């Protein structure tokens, strides 16, 4: 069972991203503030849910959350600042848009660039530990999936409606055959075995 909060007396926002390991498309992040008494048996790590379950949960989360928001960082920005910083920036943009200001942030992962004036705690595999991070994981993934499905209509060769921009054999074969699109991350190793070229 996922934990409802880390700090009972603080307004907490859970944050998570989607699309960090992709070769194409923006990186998305979500921030979610849930009521302290929020319960949902189905809510778990979004990677373990079916697509249908994720979209059903998105409706529940958006209806019952005290506040939620989604932040986006474009492929051009990713290439400019690197994917790790872009993931943090997407989370910052999500927090910026929250209608309720959180007093604490729960961040999925082990690193984060501090958000101004709001303390944070990083939680490794947090989407499998805290409800608010799991909720953020679902929003980030479903909104990014919607975006990749729209891009697929524009560029059907790359199979983005299925791989969502991740480095599958078919995706890499399409890059080799058709070249790149404006949505590909040009600082990534698009054809090789390595997924990321990170320059710190």
Swiss-Prot record:
Its EC number is 3.1.26.4. It catalyses: Endonucleolytic cleavage to 5'-phosphomonoester. One of its GO terms (cellular component) is ribonuclease H2 complex. InterPro entries: RNase_HII (IPR022898), RNase_HII/HIII (IPR001352), RNase_HII/HIII_dom (IPR024567), RNaseH-like_sf (IPR012337), RNaseH_sf (IPR036397). Manganese or magnesium. Binds 1 divalent metal ion per monomer in the absence of substrate. May bind a second metal ion after substrate binding. Keywords: Cytoplasm, Endonuclease, Hydrolase, Manganese, Metal-binding, Nuclease. Pfam families: RNase_HII. Its cofactor is Mn(2+); Mg(2+). CDD domains: RNase_HII_bacteria_HII_like. Belongs to the RNase HII family. This is Ribonuclease HII.
């Amino acid at each position: 069972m996922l934990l409802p909060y880390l700090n009972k007396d603080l307004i907490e926002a859970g944050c998570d991203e989607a699309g960090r390991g992709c070769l194409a498309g923006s990186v998305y992040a979500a921030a979610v503030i849930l009521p302290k008494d929020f319960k949902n048996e189905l809510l778990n790590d979004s990677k373990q849910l079916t697509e249908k379950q994720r979209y059903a949960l998105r409706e529940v989360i958006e209806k019952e959350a005290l506040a939620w928001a989604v932040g986006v960082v474009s492929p051009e920005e990713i290439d400019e600042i690197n994917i790790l910083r872009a993931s943090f920036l997407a989370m910052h943009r999500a927090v910026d848009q929250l209608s309720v200001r959180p007093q604490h942030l729960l961040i999925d992962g082990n690193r984060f660039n501090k958000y101004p004036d709001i303390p944070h705690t990083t939680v490794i595999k947090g989407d499998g530990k805290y409800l608010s991070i799991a909720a953020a994981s679902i929003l980030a993934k479903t909104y990014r999936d919607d975006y990749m499905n729209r891009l697929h209509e524009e560029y059907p060769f790359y199979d983005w409606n299925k791989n969502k921009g991740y480095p599958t054999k078919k995706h890499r074969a399409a890059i080799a055959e058709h070249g790149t699109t404006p949505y590909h991350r040009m600082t990534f190793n698009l054809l090789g075995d390595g997924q990321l070229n990170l320059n710190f």
